[in-house]
Structure formats: C-alpha cells, structure tokens
Amino acid sequence: MKAATDQELRKLIVLYNNVMEVMEHDAAKSMRDDNRAYGGFVRAAKGKIQELITERLVRTVWDVEMGENPERLSINSKKIKIPILRSYVDSINDENLKKYISSNILKYSYGLSVDKHVFIDNKFVLGIECKAYTENAMLKRILVDFYLLKTKFPKLNCFLFQLESQLGGDYSECNKFPIGSYPTRTIMSYFKNVDLNIVTLLEGERKVDRPINKPQFFKPLKVEHLEVAIGYLQESLSEI
C-alpha cells in the first residue's frame, strides 16, 4: 500500500475520533435545542460518519492507491428505476388487470437506491450499503435491494460497510474473508445472484447496552481494518 494511502487512512481515523468525541455533547444539545430524540440523533450521526468514511475510502483507492483519473469516478445515491417483470404480467389470471397493466406498462417501476452508487466512466460498478450496525433482520432488506439491482446490473459488485456487526459469527473480527454466522449465511443462500461482501470496521460484536458513543464503550478505528476495506475495493475496481 502506498504511503499516501496510509496517510489518508490515518486522516479518517482522526475524523472518526473527532466525531465520536463530541457525539454525546451534540446529542444532548440537539435534545435541548431541537427537542430531538437522543437515539435518533446518535443513529443518524453514526450513519453519516460511516457513509463519509466509505466514500472517502472509495476515492482514496481510486485516486491515490490506483492513481486513476478522479474525473472518471462519480458517486451518488439517485434512485434507479426497476421495471415490472413482463413474465409476472403474463402470469396474471385476471384478464382485466393484465390488460390494464399491459396498457400502462411504462408506468410500472420501483425507484430503488442503496447508500453509495459508484460509477466508473458512467458505468454502475459498485453498490455499497452503509450501516452503523447490521443485524440479520436488516440484512434481509439489504439483500432484497441488491437482488433487485442485480436484475438490471448483473455484474454489479455488492458491499455492506458497517461500523459494528450484530450478525454473529466472526464478522466482528474484521477479517477479509469471514466465515460468517449460521443465520446470516442461511439468509444469503436464498439470494444466489448477490455476492455480498460484508466489511466491518470496528472490532467486537455490537452490544445494545454498550453504545460506542459513550466514552467508556468507545471502540477505536484501526488502520489495519481500513486496509482490509481498501483491499476489497481495490480488487473490485481493478476489474473494471
């Protein structure tokens, strides 16, 4: 890994530390000034820092580690229209309903997005869902979203980037090739077209009663875990 890449990773660690250091204070201020729920503020803040870290990692891999032209890469989260399946329409027994849908077929679509859509030369190559943490009930929806996206973009690389893991197994060990957990792998087995790469940044299974925004439960963001994420992303982007 290039020295410049290492420097960028250490900047991300400083950013993470700074955000976590003031999160409790900012949450209390939000409750006082805006009458906002503490839990909602903290969840949103953790989600935002995860999204920011993820986007910075993608750009660091492309711009710094791979030395590619930054203008070739773009990231957004605009909704993508998933069209209705013609085979579904053909299978409808109600002829009136089938006729109605067929005559309005262009109106039938579902707008779908994940947190980060990564494009190279305007080609959608990476989809990344960002979570402060993930449990298996949440994973089901993530897999459904990617399943639908893969019907339109079959070569899409799919990622879940999470600060903490609540999936069980060894996801919380932050290894590159986790074995996973029994329930997680079982759920994933029903979405065979989705090869979901799960990247965890903070060690240790998430505990509801040990929130990392509390100083006594703080978890450090380590450079070696960011390096694992860098490796995943570089491998995928090198295939482009």
Swiss-Prot record:
| Protein EC | 3.1.21.4
Which gene produces this protein?
A: ddeIR
Q: List the molecular function annotations (GO) for this entry.
A: type II site-specific deoxyribonuclease activity
Q: Does the keyword Transmembrane helix apply?
A: no
Q: Where are the transmembrane segments?
A: none
The record lists the catalysed reaction(s) as:
Endonucleolytic cleavage of DNA to give specific double-stranded fragments with terminal 5'-phosphates
Keywords, A to Z, come to: Endonuclease, Hydrolase, Nuclease, Restriction system
Q: What class of enzyme is it?
A: hydrolase
Name the GO terms of the biological process aspect.
Answer: DNA restriction-modification system
Query: Which named protein is this?
Result: Type II restriction enzyme DdeI
